[in-house]
């Protein structure tokens, strides 16, 4: 087996689809010696900000001197990004070796595991092999029935900002979504919540009480954003002053405040995480594809916001960083998202739209998306593919800003197409 065939196995059609439940993951991990039982975790669930918060947590823990695993999804440029130790992606040869180990166990299962369950097993094997002190583990979807939820009580559970997304899988109300996320709360294990949505907060508080899990809700009254530009946003939070965060979205200081609160909870449990390490970790964090500036002038932004809740935060960031400016939007949206609400948020800032379809069956066809925009009075044209879309958006943008957004699934392709275009 080589790297390409290992990826083909992971992505094989037989594993496709979302099947909630923990039994398959437990069976698979048991056949592999239960590697997760050797590890300690920070478990991160939520609608938006999971990846950014997880990246901040991992960066700060590494700055404190720990060997840190980071498990996230989806990848932007390369599959190996999903499984990292101290900022280094799993090497190709190690991935091949672990796939060869997982394959017979997975193939022997009557109830075949999903792709995500296989990747979770690969991550657990690598983190155990690398003797990680702690693993920052991002939930794939929901919480209660997500395959990452097979772990024993973590060092801390973290619940990021909640909003309406994945309602088909999680339920039609914010309380349903909160209940799914709160499923990661374990007996006696502390939980830190972003908060701010009363109906969701009530659910999380109830579950925490039932599980005898100490609950901390982030006190955003202690957060003061000092300023932001296209290089960093500077903020003070709860005694940490003048932190320069290189993630420039206007929403990122709140994610940082969540991470800081969780790190201080870990410190109260005996982890040696001085504020100096928290500052260093935040100032060195990298998280591609989230309000990321690929070019300063004229600006070309890449953003992975993929639901109305995320687009609302991105729109605020665009207003803050580019006051009074209109954008050419390169847009791809999954067909199961609230397209009309996302467009309603974007249209006031739009000069024009160029639509494309990301390389996933869930993507809305480019022409269908363009028709949605035109029906709302916007200017839109559909591009044949992502490279053509990038080229057209840059052409239409001229000296003005361009923003590519709507899904993380096209971020890698957009980045590559933009790099080729600007290298010519």
Where are these regions (language model features)?
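Charged, amphipathic alpha-helical linker segments immediately N-terminal to NTP-binding catalytic cores
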Residues: 1-16
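ATP-dependent carboxylate-amine ligase catalytic core
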Residues: 18, 22, 26-38, 63-152, ...
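Nucleotide phosphate-binding/pyrophosphate-handling subdomain across enzymes
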Residues: 38, 134-137, 145-158, 162-163, ...
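A conserved segment at the C-terminal end of the G1
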Residues: 44, 52-69
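Acidic, Mg2+-coordinating active-site environments of NTP-dependent enzymes
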Residues: 110, 118, 131-138, 154-239, ...
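C-terminal helical cap/extension that packs against the catalytic core
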Residues: 194-216, 230-234, 299-302, 308, ...
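Active-site-proximal loop/hinge segments that shape catalytic or ion-binding/gating pockets
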Residues: 407
């Amino acid at each position: 087996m080589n790297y390409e065939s290992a990826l083909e196995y992971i992505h094989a059609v037989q594993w496709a689809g979302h099947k909630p439940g923990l039994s398959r993951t437990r069976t698979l991990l048991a056949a592999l010696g239960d590697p997760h039982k050797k590890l300690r975790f920070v478990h991160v669930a939520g609608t938006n900000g999971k990846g950014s918060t997880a990246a901040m947590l991992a960066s700060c823990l590494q700055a404190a001197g720990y060997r840190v695993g980071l498990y996230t999804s989806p990848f932007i440029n390369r599959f190996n990004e999903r499984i990292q130790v101290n900022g280094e992606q799993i090497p190709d040869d190690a991935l091949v070796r672990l796939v060869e180990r997982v394959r017979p166990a997975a193939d022997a299962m009557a109830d075949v595991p999903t792709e995500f369950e296989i990747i979770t097993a690969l991550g657990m094997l690598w983190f155990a092999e690398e003797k990680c002190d702690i693993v920052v583990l991002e939930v794939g979807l929901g919480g209660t029935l997500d395959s990452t939820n097979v772990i024993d009580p973590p060092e801390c559970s973290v619940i990021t900002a909640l909003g309406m997304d994945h309602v088909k899988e999680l339920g039609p109300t914010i309380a349903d979504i909160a209940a799914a996320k709160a499923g990661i709360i374990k007996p006696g294990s502390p939980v830190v919540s972003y908060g701010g949505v009363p109906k969701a907060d009530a659910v999380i508080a109830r579950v925490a009480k039932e599980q005898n899990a100490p609950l901390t809700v982030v006190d955003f009254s202690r957060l003061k954003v000092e300023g932001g530009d296209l290089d960093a946003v500077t903020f003070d939070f709860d005694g940490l002053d003048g932190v320069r965060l290189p993630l420039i979205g206007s929403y990122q200081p709140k994610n940082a405040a969540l991470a800081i609160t969780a790190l201080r909870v870990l410190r109260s449990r005996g982890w040696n995480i001085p504020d100096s390490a928290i500052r260093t970790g935040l100032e060195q964090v990298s998280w591609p594809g989230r309000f990321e500036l690929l070019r300063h002038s004229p600006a070309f932004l890449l953003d992975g916001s993929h639901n109305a809740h995320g687009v609302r935060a991105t729109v605020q960031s665009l207003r803050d960083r580019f006051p009074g400016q209109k954008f050419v939007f390169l847009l791809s949206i999954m067909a199961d998202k609230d397209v009309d609400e996302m467009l309603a948020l974007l249209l006031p800032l739009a000069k024009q739209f160029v639509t494309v379809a990301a390389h996933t069956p869930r993507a809305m066809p480019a022409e269908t998306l363009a028709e949605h925009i035109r029906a709302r009075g916007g200017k839109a044209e559909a591009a044949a593919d992502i490279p053509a879309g990038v080229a057209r958006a840059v052409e239409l943008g001229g000296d003005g800003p361009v923003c590519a957004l709507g899904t993380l699934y096209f971020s890698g392709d957009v980045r590559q197409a933009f790099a080729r275009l600007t290298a010519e």
